[in-house]
Amino acid sequence: MSKKVLITGGTSGIGREFVDVFAKNGFEVWFTYFSENEKPAEVTASYPKASVTGFKLDLADYASIESLASALPSTPDVLIHNAGLGSKTVEKVTNTPQGQAEALIKVNAIGTLWLNNLLMPKMLERGSGKIILLSSVGGGVTQFPGFNYADGMSKAAIAFLGRTLGADLAQTGVDVFTICPGATNTPMFQASTLNHLNAEEQKKVIASLPKFRLIDPREIAELGYFLTTDAGKLLHGAVLDASMGLGVNPGLLLK
């Protein structure tokens, strides 16, 4: 019987790569999307020989989270908390600073906690499971001048949750990992950091990064898949700096 993975935010960026990696490794994949504008049917149609199903989810709405938990055919073997808002994408939700701060905290941190609180007990009851949290190098590992406060706070909260769950579940069959990506070539990063720059300015930003390039979202997805293997158990509870060195040298962006 195929293992099941639930991936929140599976229609673009890192989440879309998670869908692809797990589908191609024989998992039954359940992914979430916020609206039909994300074209979830196209994601599903990409895998005619695999079981890939989309579920609508609003992480800011507890009723929506409860509805998702009830709609799942069973408890996932792997739960990947990937969905979230960024400092620019949050502008699609609300245009006030207060509303944006609230949305960032509620979607990125509180919604993730709500969903985890509904599904983790079932994993513990079963005696096995993998939980992967997506934070960010900004907030989860270090800080950058000018970084959106609420965005950074939400990512710091996810890193805290990962460490605490790692401690609480250390002697259970459920493993927990937190990944903190650096500058990754996703629509969210492009919107927050690159799209307002001209071509030369974009090249300058990328040239200032470790390894002189953006991280490919596939690299983060492959790391996540590794964590679900037996070899990944060694990293239970770890908050992984997956930034190619930006987390230990954040000043690179200021040069």
Residue locations for each model-derived region?
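Conserved glycine-rich cofactor-binding loop
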Residues: 11-12
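Conserved glycine-rich Rossmann-like NAD(P)H-binding loop of the short-chain dehydrogenase/reductase
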Residues: 25-41
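Conserved mid-core segment of classical short-chain dehydrogenase/reductases
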Residues: 84-102, 147, 190
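Catalytic loop of short-chain dehydrogenase/reductase
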Residues: 85-86, 130-157, 162-171, 183
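Alpha-helical segment proximal to the catalytic Tyr-Lys
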Residues: 121, 167-168, 233
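Short, small/polar-rich loop/turn modules that mediate ligand/substrate recognition or access, typified
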Residues: 170, 175, 235-237
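Short C-terminal tail/terminal secondary-structure segment
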Residues: 236-255
